[in-house]
Amino acid sequence: MDLYISHDKSKRLNIYLFGLFFYTSIRIKERVVNLMIKFGKGVVKHRVLILIVAFALLIPSGISFINTRINFDILSYLPSQIETMKGQDIMVDEFGTGALSFVILEDMKDQDIETLADDIEDLEGVKDVIWYGTIADSTLPREAIPDEVYDAFNNKDANSQLMLVTYSDTMGSDETMEAVNKMDKMVKNHCFVAGMAAVNADTKTLVMQQAPIYVIIAALLSMLVMGITMDSIIVPMLFLLSIGMAIIYNLGTNFIQGQISYLTLALTAVLQLAVTMDYSIFLWHSYQEQIDRYDGDKKRAMAHAISHTIVSVTGSSITTIAGFVALCFMSFTLGLDLGIVMAKGVVFGVIGCVTILPALILACDKVIEKTKHKILMPDVSRIASWVTNHYKILAVIFIVVLIPAIYGYTHDQVYYDLAGTMPDSAYSKQANERLDKEYAMGATHIIIAPSDMSKADSINMINDIKKVDGVKLAVSLDSILGPTIPDDMVPDEAKEIFKNGDYQMMLVSSKYETASDEVNNQITEIKKIVKNYSEDAMLIGEAPCTKDLITITDTDFKRVSAVSIVLIFLIILVVFKSVSLPIILVAVIEFAIFVNMGIPGFTGTKLPFIASIVIGTIQLGATVDYAILMTTKYRKNRYTGMDKKPAITKALADSTNSVIVSALCFFAATFGVGLYSNIDMISSICILLARGAIISMFVVVFILPSMFMIFDKVICATSAGFKNKNLTA
């Protein structure tokens, strides 16, 4: 009896606690909703002030953006603690040299080369100019120079000579790129400037010319899509104006990072437009619904539309931000650069969507009404019934396609040669090809060794390096002079170039191209030799840095993929209070990514290394928006008492148009830029994103509802908000 009473009291206590929790939850939810409505009413009331402030903020944002430095040196984003980057710092600190270029001189006499060398050396940013005449002066005759050194700087068959130019700052500095541009003008008729400094200079020229065009293309194509899929000409313009202002705010706040990469600059506006367009579309659709609800009271309708948009967009925007935040976990800090800027962009996009855009719509209400037209896109919501009737077939297609998609995804070919991203018309690319053709010269390595290394060790180390496969030339000051020439016969200029303070510099010329398997194996062998002679010696240069880039980004990709999946999994878990939905949604979205990234594995298309890292996170973040929209409607329908099939069919029918419009805008913005850009890194990323938008659209419209049909019982049993106990009682 006592046990029975105790159990009864416990049961009543549990009922009481549950009731209290339920009541508290409802009250909190009501307060949040009321707060959002108050915010919406505040925006409507102060819409003129909001527009004045918004337009005024464009001025400081624009000034800040103009004064934000753009970094064109991708390798500078490698971790500072690795040996190649430490060696780079030593080069700058000890030798006053941060980069080098090879200049191919055709049909020029020695006296003309000497004059040109003096002119180049006078350029701001140039430290030294080295050619065989630098060493072979009046005190050291030509006959004293080893034939291999002379041949490395001369090609009698092509009647050309080679000049090595070193710069006082790194290859991505403004001073170095300006020096390269001036040098190009000086030597353009009969000479070619090769090397990464020249590639960076060409990249800067192309990006600064093309970046504004990217924005124009993305905006025009997005407006074309919205013009077809919406009932107004003016509203798409207001969308673009609102998003454009958010983009300027985002770019204007990049000063907090000191600088941004050229890749971030080129992609930010396009991606922010494509990713945040969803929020504008949602606000407009919600506004239209609220107008019907409140009998044409547009101010009240807008206040409630803002409230609904904030509540609905919060979950999807957080997941999108999470995808970009995952990039910040990369050791290769280009990910941090892009991740921070894009995460900020989403935040500014959401803020603009619930403040600036409503104010613009209300301000332009009369014009909007006058310019309305018939929607040209057919109503595609009818496919919902077909999907729920054929979900088993679609589930089989999912499984059948998944296996080859994963195979293709794991067999993608990736390239790391940064010079390879340039178009064939780029002057630096032509110079690099000529350098390879006339001098069989691919990568150039630099050895930084202690200056007190004995002459014998220096010569022996160089001789050992010469035996490594693919080494065309290996020289130190000691190896050039040999054991018989005394130091006092060496020109002071040559001494200062190769030896300075605590370190000496040695050059190794490779026949292999940067980022190739052959050169990476060569670097490993040379490092072993160098370390045998001195633990303090370092091997640096473009190829060793690129080898580190390969190793680091391979680890980064796995880390970023894991972090992005975990973050989005947790966000879906919290938003839907479900154990099963995060698994289903992430699995379906990853399937879309596998299909997109698996296609190049079958076509044999080589992708730039950064593409695989960036695409995964951006497509994950963007696709989850579509998935959350449909899942929210599915949950609402089930909660109102609808059976499985009608609930899923209605959710799909209500979501399809929004998903298609959003995906097509994303596709249009990125595909247009991908076709136009002749910088392969930018073009490849945009084409992949465009294709990913279409694939994600099909997956969300066809595969996700099929998963809901199959796992409905599991979802309802493991998720909050799918069952209304008042209806089932």
Predicted regions and their residues:
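Membrane-embedded transmembrane helical bundles of large multi-pass transporters/channels
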Residues: 1-70, 76, 168-416, 531-729
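Structured non-transmembrane domains adjacent to transmembrane bundles in polytopic membrane proteins
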Residues: 80-197, 413-581, 587-606
